[in-house]
């Protein structure tokens, strides 16, 4: 029996109307986070409706201090304002950690279009923080190396680590809602996210002229289990609706956009969608603190019991998160190839 059937709750009117109108729902999760039983059940019902339809929503009253988000935005603005030679001293490495120059990315994993133009943004990739004696660092496991921190910005590392830890805590607290939405026990994900991996992609999208078929960030679906994106006051993010319409995400201060990615889509056997989205050139500088939240590297995406019928063949082969992540990254980034130097 589903959580909706057990609770007798239906999708809230606000969410239902947003899905009909193809608008991004905004959900107050304060009741859910406080543990109010009815709020927990209602959020699970709404979450399932969203994830089977539009795949994107915004949360407010999420407990993340706005001053922390503002400080993180200030720090990444300073990061990308550094001289080019300073940034290039931290150029992205074998582990996809560090500075990613403009035009170093073509999102080829898109299911809706053939992206052929290089994206017009700069980024800096930070993975989960590790020390030199971490077993994965010692073993030189892909994408599990040491982060490259900008020495020129003394407050940057402290601010960003605080941001990452805070976002990871929020994402972990959200897991029971996803479990309940999938008719699983609330603690189902505890052992699968016991050592979660995360990828914090800080990005700068400047106002630029583009060629036909070129974007600040091409149409794509994320790799992640879940993605969390605090909004700033500059629009640019667009989400594809079920009917193929591009919906602009309103830059609502204090809100965090949430969506699921390709790995979770595999895990749910296609039930929870990985919605295509893109970034169009903004009218002024736009920055992003995208936080991709993922399960343990060793966790394998076998369909959940509620997402596959007895005897049904899974839509995808079982795959560990780490194997999936390496494949996704290598398929989208051209920073290690000669193609990067060809405009």
Specify the residue positions occupied by each region the protein language model found.
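Peripheral, non-catalytic segments flanking oxidoreductase cores
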Residues: 1-343
């Amino acid at each position: 029996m589903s959580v909706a059937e057990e609770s007798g709750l239906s999708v809230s009117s606000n969410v239902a109307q947003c899905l009909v109108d193809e608008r991004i729902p905004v959900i107050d999760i304060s009741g859910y986070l406080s543990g109010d039983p009815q709020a927990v059940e209602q959020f699970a019902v709404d979450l399932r409706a969203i994830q089977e339809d539009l795949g994107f929503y915004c949360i407010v009253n999420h407990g993340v201090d706005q001053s922390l988000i503002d400080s993180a935005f200030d720090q990444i603005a300073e990061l990308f304002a550094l001289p080019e030679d300073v940034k290039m001293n931290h150029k992205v490495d074998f582990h996809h950690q560090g500075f990613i120059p403009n035009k170093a990315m073509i999102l080829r994993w898109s299911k809706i279009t053939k992206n052929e133009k290089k994206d017009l943004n700069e980024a800096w990739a930070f993975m989960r923080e590790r020390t030199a004696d971490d077993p994965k660092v010692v073993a030189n496991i892909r994408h599990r190396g040491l982060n490259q921190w900008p020495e020129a910005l003394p407050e940057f590392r402290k601010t960003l680590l605080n941001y990452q830890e805070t976002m990871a805590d929020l994402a972990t607290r959200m897991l029971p809602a996803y479990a309940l939405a999938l008719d699983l026990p609330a603690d189902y994900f505890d052992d699968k996210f016991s050592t979660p991996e995360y990828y914090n992609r800080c990005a700068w999208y400047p106002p630029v002229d583009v060629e036909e078929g070129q974007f600040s960030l091409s149409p794509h679906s994320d790799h992640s289990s879940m993605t969390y994106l605090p909004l700033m006051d500059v629009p640019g993010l667009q989400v594809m609706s079920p009917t193929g319409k591009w919906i602009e995400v309103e830059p609502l201060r204090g809100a965090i956009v949430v969506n699921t990615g390709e790995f979770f889509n595999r895990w749910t056997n296609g039930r929870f969608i990985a919605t295509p989205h893109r970034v169009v050139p903004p009218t002024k500088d736009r920055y992003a603190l995208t936080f991709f939240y993922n399960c343990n590297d060793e966790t394998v995406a076998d369909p959940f019991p509620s997402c596959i019928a007895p005897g049904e063949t899974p839509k995808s082969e079982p795959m560990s998160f780490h194997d999936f992540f390496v494949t996704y990254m290598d398929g989208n980034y051209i920073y290690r190839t000669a193609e990067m130097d060809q405009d």
